[in-house]
Regions:
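Extended, low-hydrophobicity, polar/charged segments
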Residues: 1-138
Length: 138
């Protein structure tokens, strides 16, 4: 379902513009707990090409962002091993909101409130195009 055509700027879209990144906006009706699968279905995109941004933390409660295909899950055990941490776990929504500056369900890796490492599933980089949240739900 299409949403209004005027879309206000977010820290993510401001960051993209400031860095000369070409992008198009695809608003949709947000569904609580719908996730990347819902946005992919509503917009008619392949869920594998819809990339979700997850805010996690390591054993020292230091935040990190993880970019993963919309139809895949993150193995926190494998992630911790890959990035040299003892453990990694998803942040509680209120903690993720505080670290990122975005509401869960509208998190973008661009324009994050707090600087943090961003880890990308390697196969995301093989895609010719991706759809990723622009800093707002919907």
């Amino acid at each position: 379902m299409a949403k209004k055509t005027h879309i206000s700027e977010t820290p993510a879209t401001a960051w993209l513009k400031a860095h000369g990144v070409v992008f198009t906006e695809h608003p949709y009706e947000y569904l609580e707990h719908g996730g990347a699968q819902h946005s992919a279905a509503v917009l008619g995109f392949d869920p594998f090409a819809v990339v979700k941004t997850l805010i996690m933390q390591d054993e020292a409660a230091k935040p990190l962002a993880v970019l993963m295909h919309g139809n895949r899950t993150v193995s926190t055990k494998n992630l911790a091993r890959q990035i040299g941490r003892k453990s990694v776990e998803p942040c509680k929504p209120e903690v993720a909101n505080r670290h990122s500056g975005y509401l869960v369900g509208g998190t973008s890796p661009f324009g994050l409130k707090r600087a943090m490492p961003v880890w990308v599933e390697a196969t995301v980089l093989d895609l010719p195009a991706i759809w990723i949240n622009g800093g707002r739900r919907g």
